[in-house]
Amino acid sequence: VTRQLAEQLTRGTALRVLDVGCAEGTQALRLARAGHFVTGIDPDPGILAVAHQALAAEPPEVRDRVQLLTGDGHQVGRWFGPRSFDLVLCHGTLMYLPDPDPMLASVARILAPGGLLSLLVRNGDALAMRAGLTGDWRACQEAFDTTRYTNRLGLPARADRLAELSGTLAGFAVPVRHWYGVRVFTDTMPDEAAPVDGRQLGQLLDAEERAGKQDPYRHVAALLHVVCAK
């Protein structure tokens, strides 16, 4: 996702960034280190405390470019005015919203003209893949006919079908500019099975990056990275 996002950003330009659902602040801090001004919001005070700890370990020039707030995506329209941000990230957020349209509408309003919206969502067109690859055939059959699922944390969640999401975003005047597949080959890989050798890990990431850009591979990815432009 980091590599994909970097492809879409103009090099050498400091952006005003909003990270909705910033969690531990991984992406927010990475962007701040690159010279961007980042506001991160998350509804979980506990996980936001982890982000504050990580921020405290950064150099002063990075800390000065980051603001962390407790809240959720539904509040962005009240907190920020139109054209407030050049880039908005909503990574792993939409899947927990029964109806994401109100938040997407708010995000579209606070984007500046030419601004980018980066979404990371569960791929509703390939929801049966994980269950099928792990041999859970009942769950596989059920997944063909729904966009609802239970995630690995045991929480209810929802997936997005690309065509439907694209139509919604176009209606909010933030049409899709590009989209990628994420976790094409590694969705069923246990965390402990990830390569520890740096060379092998690099090969894995290169393979995922390449597959995420190409048909038919990206269509069966577990996640979709959708980049929109206002």
Locations of regions flagged by a protein language model:
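Conserved alpha-helix/loop element of class I SAM-dependent methyltransferases that forms part
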Residues: 1-13
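Class I SAM-dependent methyltransferase SAM/SAH-binding core
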Residues: 26, 30-76
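A short acidic, Gly/Pro-enriched loop at the edge of an enzyme's catalytic core
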Residues: 78-87
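A short SAM/SAH-binding and catalytic strip from SAM-dependent methyltransferases
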Residues: 87-99
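A short glycine-rich, Lys/Arg-flanked "PGG" loop and its adjoining helix->strand segment in the class I
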Residues: 101-116
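Conserved class I S-adenosyl-L-methionine
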Residues: 116-144
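Short alpha-helix
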Residues: 155-173, 179
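Conserved Class I S-adenosyl-L-methionine
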Residues: 178-230
